[in-house]
Amino acid sequence: MVIFLAVLFGIVGLDRLVIVYLFPVLLPELKLNNTQAGAIASVLALTWAISTWVLGSLSDRYGRRKILLGSSIFFSVMTSFTGVAKSFHSMLLVRGLLGVGEGGVFSASVATIDEISTPRRRGLNLGIHQSFFPLLGIGLGPIIATQLVMHMRWEWVFFVLGIPGFLLTFLIGKTMRKAEASRDKQARSASASPLTVLRYKNIWLTTVIGSLFQTGLFVFSTFVALYLTKVVGLSLGTVGLIISGWGFGGFIGMIAVPAMSDRLGRRIVLVVSAACYGVLMLAFVLCHASPIVMFCNLFAAGICGFGIAPLFLAVIPCESVPSTLTGSAVGVPTAVSELIGGVLMPVVAGGLADTFGLGYPMLIVGGVSLVSALVGMFLEETVPTATSKRSVSNMDAV
């Protein structure tokens, strides 16, 4: 089940990010500027934010399976429909609807894995789940996108990429059918308000960390292809290979870093990894290097940066609240961080790029990562001990 959900989330990452790798082709053809490119990336983050919170809360009440399967079908349809959009406004509409489905997949799948995992394997399992986002979305995504667009029109790229989501939805539906029955019944009995999770200090802190991280993630992913082609002067094929290092490193980091936190503690692993990530991302922009060095830099940065994402988006929120609130606990940090980091900042960064050049948005990434390391120092440790995390309802709440 974990592997199926992980692959599905990887497809979510691929369908979400593939458009930014095609911006060098799309922007001239659709006559769009950098600010509009940022808006296209931002609208998906906006609807993802809303649906993650809303659909995550609904999955607490009505069960994971219904929300997960419905969201999966919907985002697959919208991925294919992206190939039909031929104007700025139609692209905004389709990509916004895509975010609705993808947000539901994220919150419902994280809550499902939290429920089926033992405390000692929770970090590892959630890390495996989220590791497929950078693997398919950022590691293989640039290669897939840039190679496909060399052999077919960009519209057909989106039609092709919509197919895997339907296949995974069918497989997950068959696998979850029996396992979900008892959990659905338990979920319907949950009556707490989704806002109850705001009583817990760690939810607030992971929300801040998530906002900083998502700022760096989506500013970088939105403009890195444009930066490397227009400023550095590299070919689109070379750019795809360089960016893939970020994703391949992220795949390793999202498994290794949460697994390390199972043994060493969530807080110390998050703080150290975030600090290393910030330094490496600043070096990527400030130190002009060859393509192979840039690949290696992003590979190392991906290990550190993406490695902490399962901690503040899933592991720590889930371990900080009672089991009946895990969907909401995941939804709040994700929703707010998507609104700030995914909606607002790409547009701001696009304005900076139009005014001062594409190098300025790249500097944002390293700076916000260093700040997130500082905020992480104030987290309360949640790593499981002899006492199950389900006794967390007795913890002090803010």
What is each model feature region?
Residues 129-174:
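Helix-loop-helix hairpin linking two adjacent transmembrane segments in secondary transporters
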Residues 179-207, 397-398:
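Juxtamembrane intracellular "pre-TM" segments in multi-pass secondary transporters
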Residues 267-316:
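C-terminal transmembrane helical hairpin of 12-TM major facilitator-type secondary transporters
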